[in-house]
Design a protein with these regions (language model features):
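Active-site-adjacent structural elements in enzyme catalytic cores
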Residues: 1-167
């Protein structure tokens, strides 16, 4: 795919998610099932057969990570080293700034499903599509949240043809 095709697909997916839909999104770490509303997240949980004790992850870039995560200077340097210098994807689990305007937009149900003891998971640097949709999310001030595109406990899917029909 060309960079323009990736950008166009990211815009289409973001618009669907922002309007209450759910996207099956290609990431370097496998396909993800992403929503942005409480209802879409509930639908993801029900479709996957996910237990309520499992939390969602947020989708974001390094700028989002710098704003949302409360990291020590050493931890922030390590995050940048791994994702920017070594170009590795990372699910950063860290305390977050619950007073950040984006996190304050979460309703109580979404917060219960995505934040535990002031900590979130933020997926950073998971490929070109992830970069494009993360940028759109940050620019629009609209959080993207979800998990892997599979039935619960069935393993990550790296090919769209391996995603279960229920998903």
């Amino acid at each position: 795919m060309t960079k323009q095709q990736i950008e166009d697909d990211a815009i289409s997916a973001f618009n669907i998610i922002q309007n209450g839909g759910i996207g099956v999104l290609p990431m370097d770490i496998g396909y993800s099932l992403i929503g942005g509303s409480s209802d879409s997240l509930m639908h993801i949980f029900e479709t996957k057969g996910r237990t309520s004790g499992k939390l969602n992850a947020f989708v974001g870039d390094l700028t989002s990570a710098d704003e949302l995560l409360n990291l020590t200077p050493e931890s922030r340097e390590l995050l940048h080293l791994l994702t920017k210098t070594y170009d590795l994807p990372l699910g950063a689990i860290a305390p977050c700034n619950l007073n950040h305007p984006l996190l304050k937009t979460l309703d109580s149900r979404t917060r219960r499903m995505s934040v535990k003891a002031g900590t979130i998971v933020l997926l950073v640097n998971a490929g070109p599509f992830h970069a494009a949709i993360s940028r759109l999310s940050r620019q629009a001030g609209y959080l993207l949240i979800g998990s892997s595109a599979n039935l619960s406990n069935s393993g990550t899917k790296f090919r769209v043809t391996d995603i279960e029909p229920e998903i």
